């Protein structure tokens, strides 16, 4: 997009039919995505019930006795998921002003919190948008039982989480939280369905609150300001503060994306 915004890349559908659709230039696709999201924002404002809670126990109607469809809004396309996606696409398009605007709206909405609770494996209060996958536990079991799911070399994991600089206190790399460490290798716990609350089972996270801080870091006016946004997440994850310079800022942001979303 940045290097050649008028080059034709993908088709973008605005109608539900089987008719062939011509490839569209990148800038047209981005404009279309923004237009769709802005329309969704208008439609959801003052309509979305904004119920964002994963109870530890639940009844058949989402844990509150209310209509289950109106609960667990982070399992559906909700108003703040739309705002978060606008922050994403505006950053991609190079419009940092609007990227900051929408990232801050998600953070300042006070519906989500960064949490460091190791017992909440999915960090449910951070989930802005996710999807529910039926019988996901069976699919995960089939995948994780084989050796192909193993990380054989611990050195790879250490590089991924920058252990040489950050140590092993990071919540995301700890035994029983982020990974299981065994004699045959290391297994990622990202999709494992063990020890989850009933309300979080089958949940695949698509947008986390932490991403909004990373967007703000990339848009920050100075390296010091960028470091402040990164450190808000690092502090919750149990990692010491990082210092950013003009030379390393993007590298440090990339490292945090990698650790958070691996």
Model-inferred region functions:
Residues 149-156:
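Aromatic (Trp/Tyr) and acidic
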Residues 160-162:
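Active-site-proximal, Lys/Arg-enriched surface segment
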Residues 1-147, 164-262:
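Acidic/polar-rich alpha-helix caps and helix-coil junctions
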